[in-house]
Amino acid sequence: MSVIKEYRTASEVVGPLMIVEQVNNVSYNELVEIQLHNGEIRRGQVLEIHEDKAMVQLFEGSSGINLEKSKIRFAGHALELAVSEDMVGRIFNGMGKPIDGGPDLIPEKYLDIDGQAINPVSRDYPDEFIQTGISSIDHLNTLVRGQKLPVFSGSGLPHNELAAQIARQATVLNSDENFAVVFAAMGITFEEAEFFMEELRKTGAIDRSVLFMNLANDPAIERIATPRIALTAAEYLAFEKDMHVLVIMTDMTNYCEALREVSAARREVPGRRGYPGYLYTNLSTLYERAGRLVGKKGSVTQIPILTMPEDDITHPIPDLTGYITEGQIILSHELYNQGYRPPINVLSSLSRLKDKGSGEGKTRGDHAPTMNQLFAAYAQGKKVEELAVVLGESALSDVDKLYVRFTKRFEEEYINQGFYKNRNIEDTLNLGWELLSILPRTELKRIKDDLLDKYLPLVEV
């Protein structure tokens, strides 16, 4: 049994960082406890070691710390999360402590929040469909178990409502399999936290959810730990309890701002727009924890949500996120201003694994052909609308006018399904056929004749 040493050699506090001198046998990422002069305990983590000095990152902030009277203890292990199946249905703060008034967890074990590196050879390829109940995602940008598919939003757009809708509605089609949602919120307001909790409570979805809430008035440094704690809970449920877990993380922009704050306090050389040069590497340690493992029944699927500063998709946060993840769902100010909910820009959005989770036995045999045809028809319809603005509607051919009609109905009925309508994949595919039947059969060149014969007669415009 190792002896825990106590130090009173704190020499400096700069923002969220503390320097402790004359330390030995201290390791990187080690958990630290700081006992203040009034008996209060705060936690931190070793960020850097140089000779006999350790730099400690404080999770609860540095206000009120008296350097001379503070006692520092190094725990001998990294920050760990107490995990148990009883986590499901509970609400925790950003550090994993219950805040729902329920009893403390009786932990089955303690897990390092940084997780374990996954050998690429042991990864299984994502190829099974997850139904979100949202047509623009399920049909056109299909989400697959084990995928990481971010949502790129902008200021004033309803990404919180979309996140809540996915958390309420997401499911796997095989009802025999256990499904859970892990929700990690970083830097959200009290009103937003109440919105998420109430939305899940009133639909009963909270019974299959685990919520981790880091509020805007919580220490920014806590935001660095929150997504790691949430992913640790997800990995436990997926790979030890054989559950299919969907992890929703919002807002990743707040997480990156916390990284920038720590980097500035460490006086590191800034990278693009003041963010640390290791932002890409740091984000990858989160996003790459999604996936499936050979020999394991469970899976971890991620939907990170971020707000693009100034709606700039070339900003470092969405730019680097796009490199690591497998596509993106982009929300549109134009569609939002027209009253469409959710305002998903389907032409700019992409799921790189959509072909792996669709087809006979997963969704339906007409999934991919109708998806391609809807994309083509909608893109053509938008071109015709632009042409009509320049030349006038009188210059449009009869087929062009049908494309305009299709585009209008596609946006009003398909995209604009609302935040409280849950469409299963069958209803979505049937709606797609109904809209495609507006166009002449000769225009449906991306669908084979046997599928046209099977499905087109079944719909009426």
Curated annotation (Swiss-Prot):
Gene3D superfamilies for this protein: 3.40.50.12240
Transmembrane regions: none
Keywords of the record: ATP synthesis, Hydrogen ion transport, Ion transport, Transport
An annotated GO BP: proton motive force-driven plasma membrane ATP synthesis
GO molecular function, one term: ATP binding
InterPro entries from the UniProt entry: ATP-synt_VA_C, ATPase_F1/V1/A1_a/bsu_N, ATPase_F1/V1/A1_a/bsu_nucl-bd, P-loop_NTPase, V-ATPase_su_B/beta
Family to which the UniProt record says this protein belongs: Belongs to the ATPase alpha/beta chains family.
Function: Produces ATP from ADP in the presence of a proton gradient across the membrane. The V-type beta chain is a regulatory subunit.
HAMAP family the record matches: ATP_synth_B_arch (MF_00310)
Protein name (record): V-type ATP synthase beta chain
Name of the gene encoding the protein in the UniProt record: atpB
